[in-house]
Design a protein with these regions (language model features):
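Inter-Walker segment of RecA-like/P-loop motor cores
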Residues: 58-90
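Conserved strand-helix element at the start of the C-terminal RecA-like helicase core
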Residues: 38-47, 169-186, 191
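Walker A/P-loop
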Residues: 13-26
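Loop/turn-to-beta-strand initiation segments
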Residues: 79, 93-96, 124-128
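Post-DEXD/H (motif II) to motif III coupling segment of the RecA-like Helicase ATP-binding lobe
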Residues: 107-155
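Walker A/P-loop NTP-binding motif
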Residues: 25-37
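Single conserved hydrophobic/aromatic residue that forms the stacking wall/gate
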Residues: 1-4, 8, 12, 190, ...
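Walker B catalytic acidic pair
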Residues: 100-102
Length: 199
């Protein structure tokens, strides 16, 4: 794919690597709001929506846009854009641009979109890619001038052993590995737990 953005080599590009819960998204939000305009592409609609809500609370409803495959909220005065990666209006010029979970460039179904953003999407002043360390060598080959920072996990994640679903505490996570298992778990937990979110 040819480089669309004249991928300015003078644009400050960074890659922040680390596992979940290392403060990468919080850092990206702080960086974006320090610029006059910005855009962040998230891998999930729920992440775009959650961070859109946070930004609205900080800078106000009129300055923040939400663009996903399902909904578009774009005020006339919008300066900050929260999008799914596929829905990012990359032709729009912004000072800051960020793509979250950039390692999804290796995904068989959605990877082409993340790869396109990695190669072509740039902020005019700063570009930030967030992801796990598995993408590090690819970034170094494709973007040799990209500064790479690694972050440690802010809390511990540990296996608590086998638990009955009926005895789960609030804010527990259930991880399943197939679509049928997901729906079976959700239908069962709806009977025993008052609220549940499926991500």
């Amino acid at each position: 794919t040819p480089m669309r953005s004249s991928a300015a080599s003078d644009v400050y590009k960074r890659q922040i690597l680390g596992p979940t819960n290392t403060g990468k998204t919080f850092y990206a939000m702080e960086r974006m709001l320090s610029h006059a305009s910005g855009m962040i592409g998230f891998p999930l609609r729920l992440l775009a929506l959650e961070n859109y809500d946070k930004a609205v609370n900080v800078v106000g409803l009129n300055k923040v846009a939400l663009i996903t495959g399902e909904e578009k909220i774009i005020p006339k005065e919008a300066k900050y854009f929260f999008c799914t990666v596929e829905a990012m209006p990359v032709e729009k010029k912004v000072a800051f641009l960020c793509v979250d979970e950039i390692q999804l460039a290796s995904d068989l179904e959605r990877g082409y979109v993340f790869t396109d953003r990695l190669l072509n999407a740039r902020g005019e002043e700063e570009t930030l890619f967030l992801g796990s360390e598995i993408i590090k060598k690819i970034i170094q080959k494709l973007l040799p001038d990209c500064k790479i920072e690694t972050r440690p996990r802010l809390s511990t994640l540990s296996y608590a052993g086998v638990k009955k679903i009926t005895r789960l505490k609030e804010r527990s996570a259930i991880v399943t590995f197939s679509i049928p298992e997901i729906y079976r778990t959700v239908s069962y937990t709806h009977l025993t737990l008052p609220t549940i979110a499926l991500v």
